[in-house]
Regions:
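Active-site-adjacent pocket-lining segments in enzyme domains
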Residues: 1-86
């Protein structure tokens, strides 16, 4: 599983990870990714084992998505329930 958040998604571009696939990032770097990716304005974007997220405000959703990818939906639900995320 590869996870990138905020402007860190520029590393995907440099490493040519997931080219032409869906991706998200901090809006400040969107223009740098737009031509080579299917850019989404979603808080978290999952493409196979590549997970990207927008920034500090999306970190809980990003982390829970990584938990789900690594150990399953049941564990994600177990963790997220007590957190009372909206």
């Amino acid at each position: 599983v590869i996870g990138m958040i905020c402007a860190g998604t520029l590393a995907a571009l440099g490493a040519q990870i997931g080219l032409k696939g869906p991706i998200t990032s901090h809006p400040s770097v969107k223009d740098q990714l737009d031509a080579l990716y299917e850019y989404k304005d979603s808080p978290v974007v999952v493409s196979d084992n590549f997970v990207t997220s927008r920034g500090p405000g999306t970190t809980f959703l990003f982390a829970l998505t990584l938990v789900e990818k690594l150990v399953g939906l049941e564990k994600r639900n177990e963790i997220s329930g007590p957190m009372m995320l909206v």
